[in-house]
Amino acid sequence: KPDYFEGHAVTSTNYFKAMEQFATEHELKYSGLPQGQGPNSLTEDAFIDVNGTKVYLYMESMQADYDPYRTLEKLLANLHDDGVDMMIFHPGYLDDYILKNSSLLIPRTAEVAFLTDPAVKARLEQLKIELISYKEV
């Protein structure tokens, strides 16, 4: 059973209804998008409710000038006391299918570098930011 179930890449009301219904039927933790928000235009206070916890979403990987380090600094400048702040990443390997079909080629590799950068870990530790898994939400 997956830790969570979501589909932020597609923006269709019917799609989100179907995703939520499927998650309910199969007892999966569902994470949609904040009402009235699109995946590429989330406002800084956009959140979803996951098991009674406000989850504030940050995803800028589809923006032309995307820089995960800059996104992290935005998140750190706007931390929320009433929930958790979550950056959404798409790191991973690049295979033939992804190379031919994905619009996230550069962001994928940039996110791998960012997520494995010891300076990022040190910055979060310095600020006493606790990293949690989605299972904990």
Sequence positions of predicted segments:
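Catalytic domains of cell-wall/extracellular-matrix polysaccharide-remodeling enzymes
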Residues: 1-52, 63-64
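Conserved, mostly hydrophobic/aromatic
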Residues: 5, 87, 124
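Active-site glycine- and acidic-residue-rich loops that bind
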Residues: 9-14, 57-78, 111
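A general structural detector for well-ordered alpha-helical segments in enzyme core domains, enriched
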Residues: 19, 71-75, 120
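C-terminal domain-boundary segment and adjacent tail
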Residues: 30, 101-137
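Aromatic-lined glycan-binding groove of carbohydrate-active enzymes
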Residues: 74-95, 130-132
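Substrate-binding/catalytic groove segments of enzymes
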Residues: 98
